[in-house]
Amino acid sequence: MKTIIVFLSLLVLATKFGDANEGVNQEQMKEVIQNEFREDFLNEMAPMSLLQQLEAIESTLLEKEADRNSRQKRCLGENVPCGDFPCCGKLACEKTFGYGWWYKSPFCVKPSKG
């Protein structure tokens, strides 16, 4: 019974002094919050706002994406039908006897010497 009375008295004392500490903590928290709002207000007055920074980052990302998606047109290799697309390097688009009569289109071949 004596131990229960001791624990109850400790509980009452802890709750009483705990509330006093909470009041001090709440005052400190209010000061911290006010200081943070002051810093945020000063940050809003900065020459480059957060929105401008995000727009700058977005524009650079869009430029990189546009560069990545734009490819050079590919050329056609040897013995490939060449109707609308160009042939690579030293190849010429000519009608040949081998494939041309079957597919009825010119092919990329090495130009004949002569």
From Swiss-Prot:
GO terms assigned for molecular function: sodium channel inhibitor activity; toxin activity
Removed propeptide positions: 21-74
Compartments, as annotated in UniProt: Secreted
One Pfam family hit: Toxin_22
Main localization, broad class: secreted
Keyword Lipid biosynthesis set for record: no
Signal sequence annotation: 1-20
Tissues in which the protein is found: Expressed by the venom gland.
Stretches assigned to coiled coil: none
CC annotations in GO: extracellular region
Domain of life: Eukaryota
Disulfide-bonded cysteines: C75-C88, C82-C93, C87-C108
Family indicated by similarity: Belongs to the neurotoxin 14 (magi-1) family. 03 (ICK-30-40) subfamily.
Annotated function: Ion channel inhibitor.
Domains (record comment): The presence of a 'disulfide through disulfide knot' structurally defines this protein as a knottin.
Protein name listed in UniProt: U17-barytoxin-Tl1d
Record organism: Trittame loki
